[in-house]
Amino acid sequence: MQIIWLGHGSFRIEIGDQVLLIDPWLTGNPMLAEDQHAAATTGATHILITHGHFDHTADVVALSKSLEAPVVGIYDFMSYFEAKEGLSVVGFNMGGTVTLGDVAVSLVPALHSTSYGPDATAPLGREAGFIIKGERYTVYVSGDTGISAEMDWIGDYYKPDIGILSAGGHFTMDMKGAAYAAKRYFDFKTVIPCHYKTFDLLEQSATDLIDALPDVDVIEPQVMTPIRF
């Protein structure tokens, strides 16, 4: 397995023959140079979407069509993409699990908000996170979220080894909040922070997270640099 940060809340996760793009944001992403877009997305087999905000969905339609990759996420949102955009989709709901090749993906709650499109007048489904299981590892992708009591059962039931946690503050947990959640609700071996550094109003360093979790391998990701497990 390898996990590649594409900046902000976007990731490329490679597990065996499956290549999952998580909330891929290319257009306007200040952390991912245009000449890196092809390498970031080539060969993707599925696109996983946590919620509808522009910095998580700006490129989903174009990518799904060009890559011929199904979009995976909450049922209501996927039904919209299928009906309005003609995309291939895999829709499911909270607590459900779908199989993508040798990878199992479960949908879990997040604590945020969601809307989609230029008018952004109404939510389509709700915000979510993912549990991704493959190659002996279980990864929790928090999506955009604050600290939530839902994390209690997520940690207890799925027992993820790796946590990809939104931790930039303002719109999500900050580093101290992410550390609190990791200590209280999970037993991670590895934590990868995200949704930070992108804008000035977000946290620029993971120092508070690292200092608060001395027994966890906290990896500050570098854009387009693989983290291998």
UniProtKB/Swiss-Prot annotation:
The highest taxon in the source lineage is Bacteria
For this chain, the family text in UniProt reads: Belongs to the UPF0173 family.
What single Pfam family name could you report for this chain, choosing any that match? Answer: Lactamase_B_2
Recorded GO molecular functions are: hydrolase activity
SUPFAM superfamilies registered for this protein in UniProt: Metallo-hydrolase/oxidoreductase
Q: List the disulfide bonds.
A: none
Which organism is this entry from?
Roseobacter denitrificans (strain ATCC 33942 / OCh 114) (Erythrobacter sp. (strain OCh 114))
> Which SMART domains does the record associate with it?
Lactamase_B (SM00849)
Q: What is this protein called?
A: UPF0173 metal-dependent hydrolase RD1_1994
Q: Which UniProt keywords apply?
A: Hydrolase
